[in-house]
Curated annotation (Swiss-Prot):
Involved in the mitochondrial division probably by regulating membrane fission. Loss-of-function induces the release of cytochrome c, which activates the caspase cascade and leads to apoptosis. This is Mitochondrial fission process protein 1. The modification N6-succinyllysine is found at K123. The keyword Protein biosynthesis does not apply. GO terms for biological process: apoptotic process; mitochondrial fission. It comes from Homo sapiens (Human). It is found in: Mitochondrion inner membrane. The lineage of its organism: Eukaryota, Metazoa, Chordata, Craniata, Vertebrata. It is a multi-pass membrane protein. InterPro entries: Mitochondrial_18_kDa_protein. Signal peptide: none annotated.
């Protein structure tokens, strides 16, 4: 999850608790793709996408509760929702889902050509490799998405209330 919060700081339900793991549901679904029906994988994407949407709505709500002139409130809420949604969609769903999918597909292919293991063993090995890859890819993807957004979308935001990449 994230670094420990300073004393008195508000805990973010979507980033500092077990709820954060719902954002990784699709990676788990991708890891199990060779073993479960496609509907289960799509369901895992539904769970992760619901997490992304809930976090974006929560950040917009919190941005709207900050006391300030009404004129800047709408822009601040919009920036909070868009920034959170885009960041989470890329860092929690799209990029890791694609990465785990390709790792598992490549693993299954290599195991099929390089070994004589039974198909069931190859599928379970592929699933294990996919699951083991998840913790390795999280932080590099998060930092890459921070860099991407800092270099593009976040340059378009108004300077007041600009989200930080940390």
């Amino acid at each position: 999850m994230s670094e420990p919060q300073p004393r008195g700081a508000e805990r973010d339900l979507y980033r500092d608790t077990w709820v954060r793991y719902l954002g990784y549901a699709n990676e788990v679904g991708e890891a199990f793709r060779s073993l479960v029906p496609a509907a289960v994988v799509w369901l895992s994407y539904g769970v992760a996408s619901s997490y992304v949407l809930a976090d974006a709505i929560d950040k917009g709500k919190k941005a709207g509760e900050v006391p300030s002139p009404e004129a800047g409130r709408s822009a601040r809420v919009t920036v909070a929702v868009v920034d959170t949604f885009v960041w989470q969609a890329l860092a929690s769903v799209a990029i890791p889902g694609f990465t785990i999918n390709r790792v598992c597909a490549a693993s299954l292919y290599v195991l099929g050509t390089a070994t004589r293991w039974p198909l069931a063993v190859r599928k379970w090995t592929t699933t294990a490799l996919g699951l083991l890859t998840i913790p390795i890819i999280i932080h590099p993807i998060d930092r890459s998405v921070d860099f991407l957004l800092d270099s593009s979308l976040r340059k378009l935001y108004p300077t007041v209330g600009k989200p930080s990449s940390s």
